[in-house]
A protein has these predicted regions:
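Extracytoplasmic thiol/disulfide redox context detector
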Residues: 4-97, 170
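Cysteine-centric redox/oxidoreductase cores and disulfide-bonded domains
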Residues: 95-177
């Protein structure tokens, strides 16, 4: 398993393990300082950030990941109170073809302006209904539930903008490995 996968699992375990507000705030409330190698890792190849004046927090997710699904409500709550000097970025995982397909549908929804409604619905469909949302006909039907007709879905999902967004997410994933 790659170092990125171990780090991702450790971060997810930290969030899932912090199931109460009291537990989540222990390091800050106890005066403990965060330490490299204990609370975070310094990347060998530091990544660039969009705005150096902000703290960038990137959530790497996959609609098929039950841990990502379980984390969504906590992230939504956290985002409500996040400081103005924090930039939150949602980035789909892309390490295989199925994940790239799901990255494509995420960026399609984002381009169509339906990301807020789409993300919980996609998680629910995959996690609770067991439908993987990978076939074109299935996706056309799924997007119809957001008032997106088949032709609009096809045009946006195959657009340069969506393909480029998936490629950029994939480059970031490889940079973090």
């Amino acid at each position: 398993m790659s170092r990125f996968a171990y780090t991702s699992i450790a971060i997810l375990a930290l969030f899932i393990g912090c199931s109460s507000e009291e537990q989540a705030s222990l390091p800050a409330s106890s005066g403990e300082k965060f330490s490299s190698g204990v609370h975070y890792e310094i990347l060998d190849n530091p990544t660039t950030v969009r705005d150096p004046s902000k703290i960038e927090v990137t959530e790497v997710f996959w609609f098929g990941c039950n841990h990502c699904y379980a984390l969504e409500p906590y992230i939504a709550d956290w985002k409500k109170n996040v400081s103005s000097d924090v930039a939150f970025i949602k980035s789909p995982a892309t390490w295989n073809e199925m994940l790239k397909k799901h990255a494509s549908i995420y960026y399609t929804a984002k381009a169509l302006g339906i990301e807020q409604q789409f993300v919980p619905a996609a998680f629910n469909t995959i996690q609770n209904e067991g439908r993987m949302l990978t076939g074109n006909t299935e996706l056309e039907y799924f997007f119809r539930g957001f008032n997106v007709d088949k032709n609009k879905y096809k045009a946006v999902s195959t657009s340069f903008g969506v393909r480029n967004a998936v490629d950029q997410a994939d480059k970031k994933m490889k940079q973090w490995q």
